[in-house]
Amino acid sequence: VNEDDRNGRVMLQNTKAKKYTYALKSYADYKAQILENQFAGLLLKIDNQELWVKLIGNFNAYNLLAIYATADLLGLEQLEILQLMSTLESVDGRFQYVVSEKNITAIVDYAHTPDALKNVLETINSIRTGNEELITVVGCGGDRDTQKRPKMGGIAAKLSTKVIFTNDNPRTENPTEILAQIEAGVSPEDYKKTVSIA
């Protein structure tokens, strides 16, 4: 269980099973350190071994550490685990990035929940330099959870230099109403950063 996540600690309170923890910050059975976090990937230190992976962000570091811990507990050798982990790549639509000839980086991610969007934008902000802008294009699908729309709008506006709200398959819903629900979550100070396209 992720020891850095308070929800993980809550889950451990009521189990009688043998407990193993992993963390980047807290004391845990399995620890890792992020040495480099770039758009091209992560350089991690796990059990005093360095590992380069083509995955990006803290959330992937936690996922990789969970994989490492599980494989170790199943009896795989450390170097075999690290070698296999180094071959992992992101799936299509998850933090895919392309750099244009003008050195503009575009990132595509299927972040369809507020937490996923927050993780992606925080990861980008942790990697980008101070003079780079983060322009986010985000939409919410129709006939789906309407409660998340204002949350996603607020997160996108807060964590971006500029944000463009657009449609993402409105299905049977009115696209203008979906955009209004997304915009409803934007704070007054962040509203000047937004553009909506129906």
Model-inferred region functions:
Residues 91, 122-190:
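Active-site beta-alpha connecting loops in nucleotide-dependent enzymes
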Residues 1-106, 129, 183-195:
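Acidic, Mg2+-coordinating active-site environments of NTP-dependent enzymes
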Residues 198:
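Binuclear metal-ion centers of metallo-dependent hydrolases, dominated by the metallo-beta-lactamase
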Residues 106-112:
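Switch II (G3) loop of P-loop NTPases
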Residues 1-2, 108, 138, 167:
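Active-site flanking residues adjacent to catalytic metal/cofactor-binding acidic residues
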Residues 60, 113, 149:
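Short, conserved glycine- and acidic-residue-centered signature motifs
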